[in-house]
Amino acid sequence: MRKIRLTIEYDGTNYHGWQIQKNAKTVQEVIQKALSKLLGEDVGVTGCSRTDVGVHAYGQVAHFLTDSKIPGDKFSYAINNLLPDDIVIKNSEEVPEEFHARYSAKGKKYRYLIYNSPHASAIMRNRSCHVRPELNVAEMQKAAGYFKGEHDFLAFQATGGQVRSTVREIYGMEVYVKEDNMISIEVSGNGFLYNMVRIIAGTLIYVGMGKLHESEIPGIIAGLDRTKAGKTAPAQGLYLVQIYY
């Protein structure tokens, strides 16, 4: 059997996340059906990140096994012909047997977009979080610095997370203003807890609004109390940008 790695981009608006669920359309299910149709057999696809409802991806990674003779780099073209416009296979390649989309990953990079304007955006409504009050980006940038390094991020895990350890390392976090009232939070690390990036984004929004002071962040991290951090920011602002191997 050959192992094929896929790099996938998708708009998560119309999907109930990545992972297959009963009675709900998911990205994994749509890709598996396309592959099964292409190859004429049932195909299982294993993804790296189980993105939630409404979350988008530029660089989701998945793998599948096949006996097909199709060249590894040609699968992307063949599968894309069978996929809806909001899911695109950006790259496909044959990889060694020991590669695993999830367990071989060394880290991930996420982006969270905030549309900071008194008026909502018709175009970006499903691709960013709308915040009306003007945010103090300088304070958000100061606050972001406290997250870097290895910490116990229990205060930034949503209910339902099931992991042995809540310690994670953040490699980098940047907050900057893009064009057209858009603020971007970029964060990379060796792993993330359930809803961790969205809770960090919600906390930085609180700092930008003045509901929290940037100097309070170390205490919130050390306190391990979810109620002290900000609200979980909406899913539509979150993007899985890249997975590191």
Curated annotation (Swiss-Prot):
Catalytic residues (UniProt): D52 (nucleophile)
Keywords: Isomerase, tRNA processing
Recorded family membership: Belongs to the tRNA pseudouridine synthase TruA family.
Gene Ontology process terms (BP): tRNA pseudouridine synthesis
UniProt KW Isomerase keyword: yes
Reactions performed catalytically: uridine(38/39/40) in tRNA = pseudouridine(38/39/40) in tRNA
Assigned EC number: 5.4.99.12
Gene name in the database record: truA
PANTHER family, A to Z: PSEUDOURIDYLATE SYNTHASE (PTHR11142), TRNA PSEUDOURIDINE SYNTHASE-LIKE 1 (PTHR11142:SF0)
Function: Formation of pseudouridine at positions 38, 39 and 40 in the anticodon stem and loop of transfer RNAs.
Protein name (Swiss-Prot/TrEMBL): tRNA pseudouridine synthase A
A Pfam cross-reference name: PseudoU_synth_1
Binding site for substrate: Y110
GO terms assigned for molecular function: RNA binding; tRNA pseudouridine(38-40) synthase activity
UniProt cross-references to InterPro entries, sorted A to Z: PsdUridine_synth_cat_dom_sf, PsdUridine_synth_TruA, PsdUridine_synth_TruA_a/b_dom, PsdUridine_synth_TruA_C, TruA/RsuA/RluB/E/F_N
Subunit structure: Homodimer.
